[in-house]
Amino acid sequence: GKLSRGLGDVYKRQILKRARSVTKNYDAFTDAANDYFIKGKGDLYDVKKKLYLSMINVNILEGLRFYVSFACTFAFGELKKMEGSAKIVSLIARDEAQHLALTTHIIKNWDNNDDKDMKKIAKECEGDIVDMFEQCVAEEKAWAKHLMKDGSIIGLNERLLGDYVEFIANKRIKALGFEPLYNLSLIHISEPTRQLA
């Protein structure tokens, strides 16, 4: 009824808010590629730059986004609750790990002179990359806050999930050759949860 519609609207707003930062680089790339290859406008360097940022976006999508939700789902699974969902999400996480490895490999090849423009673009985009990671971390933390607004659940809380997201972000950005963004100790994060990262 009316209550479920209201809750649905809240979740839709939260999801749409998170989706905007996911899609903006893809949209910019497809627009630039369409302009250059179909309409004959723009320049190839701009297309490559937008491709590079889109690949970084895929890397973040596959390796950092939704990890708050993953952690919650796996916590339920460890408690023998919602085991079917936990199994399905584990398959999704495995698939995302493969995509993460692939995008990391592509980005590292570009950074190592696979394409002279891409190496230059990588250097130019360092600030953008850090901003993209920080934005994703902020959005994941906001999602954790939203999920935990009524209190902690199944041994998880907003702080723990926030630290976990920072831990994963550090791991992912280091794999791309950057310094860690966050200074934190993870004594309170369980080994199974660390392994997910």
Regions found by a protein language model. Give the residues of each.
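A contiguous catalytic/ligand-binding core that recognizes phosphate-bearing ligands
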Residues: 13, 36-51, 189
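Alpha-helical bundle segments that constitute or directly flank the non-heme di-iron/ferroxidase center
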Residues: 51-76, 98-102
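Extended, helix-rich structural scaffolds rather than catalytic motifs
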Residues: 112-186, 190, 194-197
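Inter-helical turn/loop segments and adjacent helix faces that build the functional surface
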Residues: 42-53, 71-91, 105-127, 148-152
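Single conserved hydrophobic/aromatic residue that forms the stacking wall/gate
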Residues: 1-14, 187-197
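Amphipathic alpha-helical hairpins
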Residues: 4-5, 88, 92-106
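Long, hydrophobic, well-ordered secondary-structure blocks that form the structural core
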Residues: 4-38
